[in-house]
C-alpha cells in the first residue's frame, strides 16, 4: 500500500526527532567522558563509538540485525519480554541512533574541549557538586555545541539509508523513510516520485545544516 510523500516526510522527521532525543544525552555523556577523563579503555571506547562512521552502513545494519536475532542474547531478551524491534519503527530509530551517534559525539567533544576548565574549578571550589557543576557551568557553556550537534545528528538521521533498509526494511507507512522511498522509486523506474522525494530530502537536510552553520558562525564571533 502506497503512502503519500507528506506522510513519508512526517514519518521520517518524527523518527529523526525521536532518534536525536535518545542519542543526544548518550552522546553528551560519551563526549564529556572522552574530553575530560583519562582511563585505560579510552581508545576502545573511541573506536567503538566511531565504528559506524567508517563501516559501510549496510554492514552496520547487518550487525544490528544479528544482535537483535533470536539466537543472540539481546534478541532472546527482547523476545522474552515480547518486544519486537526488527522491521518495525523501533528498528528505524535504532539505526538512526547508531549512525548519527559518532557525529554527535565528535561535535560535542570539540565543544567540551573548548570550555575553560577554570570556570568549573571555581564552581567546585565554591562547594558545587560535580553534577551541579555540570548542570550550571559546563552545559550552559556548551549549549551552542549541543544545539549544533543535535541539528547535525538530526540531518544525519534523516539521510540514513543503508542500516535502516537492512534492519527495518521498506514497509510503506511503517518503516519507509524518505531515503528508503527514494531508493524504492529509483529501483522501480518511478523517476517523477523519486525526484519529489529527492527535493524534499535536500530541503530538510539543507535547512538543518544551514541552521547549524549559522549557529557555529555566531559561536565563533568574539
Positions of predicted regions on the chain:
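Short hydrophobic alpha-helical segments within the ABC transporter permease transmembrane module
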Residues: 5, 108, 129-150, 154
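Cytoplasmic-entry segments and transmembrane alpha-helices of multi-pass inner-membrane transporters
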Residues: 30-64, 120
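Transmembrane alpha-helix signature in integral membrane proteins
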Residues: 5-34, 97
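Non-cytoplasmic
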Residues: 69, 146-184
Amino acid at each position: 500500500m502506497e503512502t503519500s510523500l507528506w506522510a513519508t516526510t512526517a514519518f521520517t522527521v518524527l523518527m529523526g526527532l525521536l532518534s536525536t532525543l535518545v542519542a543526544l544525552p548518550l552522546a553528551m555523556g560519551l563526549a564529556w567522558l572522552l574530553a575530560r577523563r583519562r582511563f585505560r579503555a579510552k581508545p576502545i571506547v573511541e573506536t567503538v563509538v566511531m565504528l559506524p562512521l567508517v563501516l559501510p552502513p549496510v554492514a552496520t545494519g547487518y550487525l544490528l540485525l544479528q544482535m537483535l536475532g533470536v539466537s543472540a542474547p539481546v534478541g532472546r531478551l527482547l523476545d522474552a519480554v515480547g518486544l519486537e524491534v526488527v522491521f518495525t519503527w523501533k528498528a528505524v530509530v535504532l539505526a538512526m541512533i547508531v549512525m548519527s551517534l559518532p557525529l554527535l559525539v565528535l561535535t560535542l567533544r570539540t565543544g567540551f574541549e573548548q570550555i575553560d576548565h577554570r570556570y568549573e574549578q571555581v564552581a567546585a571550589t565554591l562547594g558545587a557538586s560535580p553534577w551541579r557543576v555540570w548542570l550550571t557551568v559546563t552545559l550552559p557553556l556548551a549549549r551552542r555545541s549541543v544545539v549544533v550537534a543535535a541539528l547535525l545528528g538530526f540531518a544525519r538521521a534523516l539521510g540514513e539509508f543503508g542500516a535502516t533498509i537492512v534492519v527495518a526494511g521498506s514497509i510503506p507507512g511503517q518503516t519507509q523513510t524518505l531515503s528508503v522511498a527514494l531508493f524504492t522509486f529509483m529501483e522501480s523506474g518511478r523517476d517523477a516520485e523519486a525526484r519529489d522525494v529527492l527535493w524534499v530530502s535536500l530541503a530538510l537536510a539543507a535547512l538543518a545544516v544551514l541552521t547549524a552553520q549559522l549557529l557555529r558562525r555566531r559561536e565563533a564571533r568574539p
